[in-house]
């Protein structure tokens, strides 16, 4: 609003990516994350393509009212990954891609998390994600380059949500737990 300049979504994503890489926060500019924040739904993004052409798949979001998303923030990274760290985990990332192609983003989230935790050699992250499944989560995985854990639980299973929150706050008191949901189409309507 300050300049009254209207930007297209791909221009906003490009600006965000430039800020991420210039500050050293991200290896790739987090283009996929920026696209994910632009609108509800899940997207498959080619971070090597020009930003305006990089969204390969764009599908509707899972119903926001049906799912609770828990973010377990573990503090700053202890290891700064490189792109080479991820190369050895292509099988897990291919499984994530196949799950997206089958329109199953929760399975994709889990496979992506497995690939990431292996690439980072994050034993604690793997244990924490597995603990989520032991406590009845539907999906869980470490974030793109760590160290946060993303956990998805059916929202009608309130006791499960509370049990998982209690589990992490008891065993990992230094972690911050955020309860949220997927973006809904109503939010997209409000933004327009």
Where are these regions (language model features)?
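ATP-dependent small-molecule kinase catalytic core of the GHMP/sugar-kinase superfamily
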Residues: 11-133, 155-159, 163-192
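Short beta-strand
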Residues: 139-143
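DPxDG-like acidic metal-binding loop motif
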Residues: 1-9, 38
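Short hydrophobic/aromatic beta-strand micro-patches
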Residues: 150-154
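Glycine-rich nucleotide-binding loop
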Residues: 146
